[in-house]
Amino acid sequence: MIVESREIKLKHRIPVKKTANYWKGLEEGRVFKTVCRNCEKSYYPPRADCICGNQTEWVEIKEKGFVECFTVVHSIPACFEWSKPYRIVIARFGDVCVMGWSEEDLRVGDEVFISTAKDESGIWKIWFRR
């Protein structure tokens, strides 16, 4: 049995003033987290202010990561209709987890490196590779 559903298209406007370094980093092929100058808590996605009330500093995620979990999406939303089934991966890089995409057949525990690239629609994405 198949039930027809309605098409939903969303377009988000993201305020980026306080996180402009993150978006600029993606364009440069770099991914950043933020770390509190006082309590040393790390944040990804990055945030400008820590919950302890202090400012954070920008730190590039450079080390290797490890796949924590993944899923292959077969039910593709309209905004990704150009895509074939795709793999979403969450990888741990030290004290933060990062969600991204991979074209490789990654498994839990695999070592990965992080990079950025624009997709077919011109949106910057995070990619994982061995």
Predicted regions and their residues:
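Cys/His-rich short segments
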Residues: L26-K64
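OB-fold (S1/OB) nucleic-acid-binding surfaces
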Residues: E81-V98
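N-terminal intrinsically disordered, low-complexity, charge/repeat-rich segments that act as generic
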Residues: M1-E40
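Well-ordered alpha/beta subsegment
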Residues: V96-R130
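A generic structural motif
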Residues: K62, T71-H74, G94, L106
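Short, conserved beta-turn/loop elements at beta-strand boundaries and strand-helix junctions
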Residues: C69-I76, D119
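Conserved hydrophobic positions within beta-strands
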Residues: G65-V67, S102
